[in-house]
UniProtKB/Swiss-Prot annotation:
Keyword Aminoacyl-tRNA synthetase: no
Domain of life where this protein originates: Bacteria
Pfam families registered for this protein in UniProt: Pup_ligase
Lineage: Bacteria, Bacillati, Actinomycetota, Actinomycetes, Mycobacteriales
Organism: Corynebacterium kroppenstedtii (strain DSM 44385 / JCM 11950 / CIP 105744 / CCUG 35717)
Keyword Nucleus included in the entry's annotation: no
Name by which UniProt lists this protein: Pup--protein ligase
């Protein structure tokens, strides 16, 4: 590995999260999902005449296909910044859910809105958590397909959300017995690398939309991951991916771990909590998820010894925290005793809850209460979701200790180190001055009285004199 190569230790990244939504009263559906989703977005539509907007923090909020609220973080350039802005989306959605409940009450409809940060519903439909990483054009898609995919396929062992797989949603050989799996997303992925997102659901989407200078960058769109409730799980998921991308850019080779059949292997791994399910490699050798992850973690520790420190980006100290957690999780799984990570990793936390109910009541995984727990774990509503309740009581680990006020502030304030700052500042001034404007990831536009727009193709730049001039023109009206 060579730190002299074009390695992005400061990398632009973001997360897009689709949420499940229901409205219940006394355990029964009170409002249909389509209707409650529209009610959730009514304040947005009433104000902006659209259910697809960019927010004051520079992110994006919209109602996706299938009545799924979706939040995309603004561009972030460090691990902790991304985790804060991912949580900030929950703040925004919880505000909307509170307003929706009050609106229902005004209509004399009793109902509680639930927002699930998960990846599958009770009918077996899947919705995503998509990770976006900016990479240079110098790194070839073929190399990513061969050497990044083995990491992505096996990382469910260290950061899966956990899931009771039901017969209708399992990819099985006729066995219809429900089973606890590592990943919610694994059974819904069918290809390694593809330009599709919904039809075939690849691990890496190759549709070339960099939202930046296309001659310099590409946006790596990873759609295989589970949504994370736990901050430590999210930190491990994102942080380990950042390290692997850095190592690939630095010239490290992981071609010995190229997997022969990615779509089958990702399912096999998901059903084996020990990490020892057979993984046939392209070379003909048989490995397992545990061995592959151990190899990546060992290389990551070596990389940290030469990783350059940037003024911005994720500090080496935070990356060392990631590697320490990575090794801790793998050691626990290797030993067969996961008690040391029972407050750190989503699939372990959830499994322990389910195990306790099974031990107490003798239920098997078909019991409706256990299936309810599977979903309630992911409810982001304060005081309603299982995980957030555990977090409030200090029963699970935090990566962002003491950051609650920063998370709340981030719902309305953009990152100060990326292009999102200009977008957020522009929108704030426009809204405060009732100006007719529009934005997207790369453009700012004043619509009236004289149309004027600029393209911002450098996502690393937090300042541009042209953006300052546009803001000044609004203030000078």
């Amino acid at each position: 590995m060579s730190a002299d190569k074009a390695v992005f230790t400061r990398r632009i990244m973001g997360i897009e999260t689709e949420f499940g939504i229901t409205c219940t009263h006394d355990g029964a559906q009170a409002v249909a999902p389509d209707d409650i989703a529209r009610q959730l977005f009514r304040p947005i539509v009433d104000r902006f005449r659209s259910s697809n907007i960019y927010t004051l923090n520079g992110g994006r909020l919209y109602l996706d296909v299938g009545s799924h609220p979706e939040y995309a973080t603004p561009e972030c350039d460090s691990l902790n910044q991304l985790l804060i802005y991912d949580r900030a989306g929950e703040v925004t959605l919880n505000r909307l859910a509170d307003q929706a409940e009050h609106a229902l009450a005004d209509q004399h409809i009793e109902g509680t809105v639930h927002l699930m940060k998960n990846n599958t519903d009770s009918l077996g439909n899947s919705y995503g958590c998509h990770e976006n990483y900016l990479v240079g054009r110098a790194i070839l898609l073929k190399k990513l397909g061969q050497e990044f995919i083995p990491f992505l396929i096996t990382r469910q062992l260290i950061c899966g959300a956990g899931h009771i797989a039901r017969p209708h949603s399992r990819f099985s050989d006729g066995d219809t017995t429900p089973v606890y799996q590592l990943s919610q997303r694994a059974d819904h992925v069918w290809e390694g690398v593809s330009s599709a997102t919904t039809r075939s659901r690849p691990i890496i989407n190759t549709r070339d939309e960099p939202h930046a200078d296309s001659e310099m960058y590409r946006r790596l769109h990873v759609i295989v991951g589970d949504s994370s409730m736990s901050e430590t799980t999210a930190a491990l998921k994102i942080g380990s991916a950042l390290l692997v991308l850095e190592m690939l850019e630095a010239g490290c080779s992981f071609d010995e771990w190229e997997i022969a059949n990615p779509s089958k292997t990702i399912r096999d791994i998901s059903r084996d909590l020990t990490g020892r399910a057979e993984v046939p490699l392209r070379s003909g050798r048989i490995s397992c998820a545990l061995e592959i992850q151990q190899a990546f973690a060992e290389k990551a520790q070596q990389w940290l010894d030469e990783r350059p420190e940037e003024q911005h980006g994720t500090p080496n100290a935070d990356m060392q925290r990631v590697v320490d957690l990575w090794k801790k999780v793998l050691a626990a799984i290797d030993s067969g005793d996961t008690s040391s990570i029972e407050a750190d990793i989503d699939w372990v936390i959830k499994k322990n809850i389910i195990d306790r109910y099974q031990d107490k009541f003798g239920w098997d995984l078909t019991h409706p209460k256990l299936q309810q727990i599977d979903y309630a774990y992911h409810d982001i509503r304060p005081g309603k979701g299982i995980f957030r309740t555990l977090e409030e009581r200090g029963r699970v680990s935090r990566w962002l200790d003491g950051a609650d006020s920063s998370i709340t502030d981030a719902a309305d304030t953009p990152p100060q180190t990326t292009r999102a700052k200009m977008r957020g500042d522009f929108l704030r001034v426009a809204q405060e001055n009732d100006a007719d404007v529009s934005v997207d990831w790369t453009r700012l536009k004043i619509n009236r009285p004289e149309p004027h727009d600029i393209a911002l193709l450098d996502p690393f730049a937090a300042h541009d004199s042209r953006a300052d001039d546009m803001i000044s023109s609004i203030l000078d009206r």
